[in-house]
Amino acid sequence: DTIGFVFQNFQLMPRESALDNVCLPLIYAGVSKKDRRQMGMEALERVGLSDRADFKPTQLSGGQKQRVAIARAMVNHPKLLLADEPTGALDSKSGKQVLELFESLNESGVTVVVITHDRKVAEQAKRIVHIIDGEITEEGQEAGNEKEKEN
């Protein structure tokens, strides 16, 4: 079983193409070059960027960079995907696309854990855990209950 990780600031290799960035975990997993390319293209297709496979990060928008980072995180078909502030550097449209992608991954059986300070992002979750100074202060709140709690 593998874990995927989406960094807050993408962490893409600037001199490598989107496809090469996505394929990096497969190199460490010992996947053949032929299989890496196929798996990388499938991951880029899933995030809607197969037409940008040869683009360098400097040629991509912030939302596209984040989707490349998500493709890289999911290329090994992880059971768990951790995302650190995945929408923090994105405009609202790109942020919505990222959250929809996470929802799709979750529906396909991937456990997605999103770390965020953004209440609107947290409200999209099935379960919310509040942590302050390393301590869990609330747990198990269902999505959509934020408004009830505030009233």
Where do the language-model regions lie?
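ABC ATPase nucleotide-binding domains
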Residues: 143-151
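H-loop (His-switch) and adjacent beta-strand-loop-beta switch element
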Residues: 128-141
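Flexible, glycine-rich phosphate/dinucleotide-binding loops
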Residues: 121, 137, 145
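ABC family nucleotide-binding domain
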Residues: 1-131
